[in-house]
A protein has these predicted regions:
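Short, exposed beta-strand-loop hairpins at the edges of beta-sheets
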Residues: 127-150
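Transition segment at domain starts
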Residues: 24-72, 104-108
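Solvent-exposed coil/turn segments that connect beta secondary-structure elements
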Residues: 74, 81, 93-96, 143-145
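Polybasic/polar functional segments that serve as interface/processing modules
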Residues: 1-9, 28, 93
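Hydrophobic membrane-insertion alpha-helices, especially the h-region
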Residues: 5-23
Length: 155
């Protein structure tokens, strides 16, 4: 009986430690956030502006984003916070979606823009051949767990 109790208690702590590791590792290894001054300097170059908002149908307490998104010809600039997690990707889509069930069918048509390692105030350089006019939505997606994080329609 004592062996069974020890087995389950140690197993529970192992599972909790593993889950905490998955959650905390991206936070601990995230690059430094962009300075507000850097973000504000890029405001004059913006071609599109939108906002990530909490409360989308694909959001929950672990998957959300909130803040202003500015798009220039050469950068995606974000001033706000995104729920931390592993393996985040930025995509552009031609259709506004706000849930993984809506994104998965059109993922093959979406344009992968960049990996995302920051969860607060970031500036992502963009390949010069990305044409934002061909899309209308920016989306953040967790590739590892196939989870929608947030999206915003910019045109």
């Amino acid at each position: 009986m004592k062996f069974i109790l020890l087995f389950f208690s140690h197993g529970a702590f192992l599972a909790i430690g593993f889950a905490l590791g998955i959650y905390l590792l991206p936070i601990l290894t995230a690059p430094k956030s962009a300075d507000i001054e850097q973000i504000e300097k890029l405001r004059s170059k913006l071609i599109y502006q939108t906002e990530f908002k909490k409360g989308q149908s694909g959001n929950d307490f672990l998957h959300w984003g909130e803040g202003k998104v500015m798009i220039t010809n050469t950068e995606i600039v974000f001033k706000g916070k995104i729920a931390p997690g592993p393996d985040y990707k930025i995509y552009l889509t031609k259709k506004y979606v706000e849930h993984e069930d809506e994104f998965l069918p059109i993922k093959s048509e979406a344009l992968f823009v960049s990996d995302l390692k920051n969860f607060e105030n970031f500036i992502i350089p963009i390949n010069s051949n990305v044409n934002f006019n061909n899309y209308n939505t920016i989306l953040i997606w967790c590739e590892a767990f196939k989870e929608f994080i947030t999206s915003a329609k910019y045109q």
